[in-house]
Amino acid sequence: MEENKINIFYESLEKSLSVEKSELLFNHIMAGDFSDIKLSAILSTIRSRGETVDEIIGATKAMRKHSKKIISDENIN
């Protein structure tokens, strides 16, 4: 797992990521696996080169997996 995390970290700094690689990266981010400095480097790099559709989809999938489901009896419009 550690090697996988390191590989995806460096890959995210070098080039745009596929949906699968982006989801893997954001799973690590959501799990708190990166230091603040590494997280800053990742997000700054992705932002400076411009997020791709694949990166956004992968990030969304990861965030949905890590989100908490809320059940309510109220009807919310």
Question: For each predicted feature, which ranges?
Answer:
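Acidic, glycine/proline-rich low-complexity segments that act as flexible tails and inter-domain linkers
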Residues: 1-77
